[in-house]
Amino acid sequence: RRVEQYVEMVMVYLRLDSESTDFVIRTYDLDGIIRAAVRPFAGEFIGRRLQLHYEPLDYRAVTDEKWLGFVIGHVLSNALKYTSRGGITISMPEHGILSIRDTGMGIAPEDLPRIFERGYTGCNGRTDRRSSGIGLYLCRRVCDALGHTITARSAPGEGTEIRIGLRRRGLTIE
């Protein structure tokens, strides 16, 4: 699974740097995108006895289904990588804001402002050597291209929350 993720990240990187992308901007059911992103991790949730807290959000997002799915999938992958007990909560605390919150190890305050930089792994990534420093950078690039925002809140020992702002900024529906 890890090799597949690295290959996917390289392909995303190359596609984002090309002159044309394959964005299909439409109105999509966010719950369908979330379920498709969660599905590949079901075995890991079960095997590691981590809980997934998720209630359908009943939200329609103007986005690209495949690319937003990539972002959600990568955020889930990171959350699972750094969470040893407890679980992950997917919610919409404010209209148009998707939250993915974990009970993992959290991110050091000095690392938090840099986690979306290309190649930055931070203390956690350097310690366990399971980080390429490219995933969250790609998530930021995809969100920027889609007119979405992505931000992080975290505290060591308390977990991390990634928020994806889905309100439309400059997107035209096909």
Task: Put a short name on every predicted segment.
Residues 18-23, 56, 60-63:
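Conserved micro-motifs of the catalytic ATP-binding
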Residues 79-80:
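Short helix-loop "hinge" at the ATP-lid/N-box region of the Bergerat-fold HATPase_c
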Residues 87-97:
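Short beta-strand/loop element within the Bergerat-fold HATPase_c
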